């Protein structure tokens, strides 16, 4: 009886792959069930990730959020913020340039020297009090952020978004993603990807900071 029961569990599905009334490549029910489970898992795993929000657009209002204050006192003074945390509206100046970046993002490293040049130009053109620059490193730890600053890769302050909270609020943009914000959190300009022409970008910042 046990043998007959075992044979019953492995009934051959003869309606699949028939040729001339004879079975071709017989498939057992347990195998079909397994294939069904695998297909279901694949449909879930391969589905595109859902974004929590849309990317910020020009003239939209940025959702409220806080960031950990930079550990270096010189960066705190530059931004005009104090530990433990601050909101974008707390930053000194009229215009805040926010760069969403990744610690291991190749395009971010491509943009870094361009933005360092932009940072220097802002200081030289006496815009330093009106325009501030801030990098937000998504998924980064304190150690990784401190390494970025100490290595000289970034001359402006970088803070971490270790748990991706801000990244999700902003619609999970690819990196780098740049925003120009007003004091009250209004989005003045956005750019997804590397800003290669700093000479063309700088006049826009000047105009917004008047």
Each language-model region and where it sits:
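Short, Lys/Arg-enriched N-terminal segments with co-localized hydrophobic residues
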Residues: 4-22
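Bacterial N-terminal signal peptides
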Residues: 32-47
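N-proximal helix/coil linker or "cap" segments that precede and/or mark the start of modular domains
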Residues: 46-78
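A short beta-strand-turn-helix
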Residues: 67-96
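Conserved redox-active cysteine motifs that mediate thiol-disulfide chemistry
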Residues: 92, 100-117
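Hydrophobic beta-strand anchors of alpha/beta hydrolase catalytic cores
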Residues: 97-98, 133
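Structural microenvironment flanking redox-active thiols in thiol-disulfide oxidoreductases
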Residues: 109-152, 165-167
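Thiol/disulfide oxidoreductase modules built on the thioredoxin-like
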Residues: 148-154, 162-205
